Amino acid sequence: MIKPRTPPGIMELLPREQIAFQRMLDVIRRNYERFGFLPVETPVFELSDVLLTKSGGETERQVYFVQSTGALANAAAAADAGGENGGLPELALRFDLTVPLARYVAEHEHELSFPFRRYQMQRVYRGERAQRGRFREFYQCDIDVIGKDALSIRYDAEVLAVIHAVFAELGIGDFKVQLNNRKLLRGFFHAQGVVDAEQQALVLREVDKLDKRSAEDVRATLMGPDFGLAEDAVRRILDFAKIRSVSHADALDKIDWVVNEVQSRSGGNEDLHAGADDLREVLELVKALGVPESAYCLNFSIARGLDYYTGTVYETTLTDHPQIGSICSGGRYESLASHYTKSKLPGVGISIGLTRLFWQLREAGLIQGIAESSVQAMVALMDETRLDDALDIARRLRIGGINTEVQMEPKKVGKQFQYAARAGIRFVVLAGDDELARGVVAVKDLVREQQFDVARDELASTLQVELEQARAMLVAGGVQGD
């Protein structure tokens, strides 16, 4: 007999946790749609040459390839015969949603309306080294706005407003969207003598590690043989990376201070001024969108490690749980699909890694206030002769919007109560001879441990009221129900 087990790096949930996870998905989807984003799904596997066109190194080593048993047999036979095995398998599982989006937009470019606003919430796969909190299969929940030839900076502000709406409704605690601009970073580094674009990208990666490594470690790296930066330049870079704003007005002041500081030393440069102008406009529009200033700040150490970001960058953290790290990140890029089309397709987007976020919230005890079951009521079967009545009551409840289960075989009432309690079902509906003769049913509320009679025709509306009251009480307790 084979021992039942799952591979490492998989998060498999019991029903109660799956309900909580699903409700988080629903909150994210609902807010994406409120802002006018359209759903897209792409295949779980793509053609290998399409998926890997711009990857390499670590990414390619983490890709899962897909091969049929027939193809495997043919490859093995070819190898046994001393021939070539044909190279990489034809298909590979997606490792993120960005590359499939690039392929999708390039392939359907002439069928889409631009700016194209898309959301995508699907599993992705990476061959991560097995360790606690790292997953090989995980959900990503992405939005992107894609332009044709150009895309207004105003969308960068709207994306931040989406982040705020999502996490405000999730109710998992105070959070902060941290904001920066890669152009401003490049301009600042240029003023410190880091002129080469490739070296700037490497310095950006080091600055982006400041939340994981000490400033002294980063200082030593930047002054070491790989970078060889002067001590004064490194000091100014690290001082710059410490800058945080505490209010909307302070953020604008900090931008002006950085620009003036660089101008006084080197006269400024185009990237610095362009990045500063973009940040100012984003901040003013974020305010106009109604995002409270307590929910966002400037953080000049935010760089995002991916090189394709060219402007605004975001990282979101939980204020009371900084150890969780970034719970949502993204930014602006200038050419989404340059490997698939000659068209220029700039965009801005963010991604929520929901599987890792859910796991961390569960570990921190922040997944609260969730019903144990998606079933809201159970109709008990008192005896065989009342099956038709039980089915009719269940039908009426479902029409009234109540998720309802029916006991299909008569059992002792105590056993039916026990089953409902273990399954996390709140209401048990009893329809015996006495109740039916009076035109009512009895309802047992297993949460309040109360029993009451309700007219048969008013059962669904009565339970709806009870459930709405329960939802209202849970709003402050964690992720909200539907």
Curated annotation (Swiss-Prot):
One of its GO terms (cellular component) is cytoplasm. One of its GO terms (molecular function) is histidine-tRNA ligase activity. Pfam families: HGTP_anticodon (PF03129), tRNA-synt_His (PF13393). CDD domains: HisRS-like_core (cd00773), HisRS_anticodon (cd00859). The keyword Nucleotide-binding applies. It catalyses: tRNA(His) + L-histidine + ATP = L-histidyl-tRNA(His) + AMP + diphosphate + H(+). PROSITE patterns: AA_TRNA_LIGASE_II. InterPro entries: aa-tRNA-synth_II, aa-tRNA-synth_II/BPL/LPL, Anticodon-bd, Anticodon-bd_dom_sf, His-tRNA-ligase, HisRS-like_core, HisRS/HisZ, HisRS_anticodon. Coiled coil: none annotated. It is an enzyme of class 6 (ligase). Transmembrane segments: none annotated. Its EC number is 6.1.1.21. One of its GO terms (biological process) is histidyl-tRNA aminoacylation. Keywords: Aminoacyl-tRNA synthetase, ATP-binding, Cytoplasm, Ligase, Nucleotide-binding, Protein biosynthesis. Gene3D superfamilies: Anticodon-binding domain, Bira Bifunctional Protein, Domain 2. Homodimer. HAMAP family: His_tRNA_synth. Belongs to the class-II aminoacyl-tRNA synthetase family. This is Histidine--tRNA ligase. The gene is hisS.
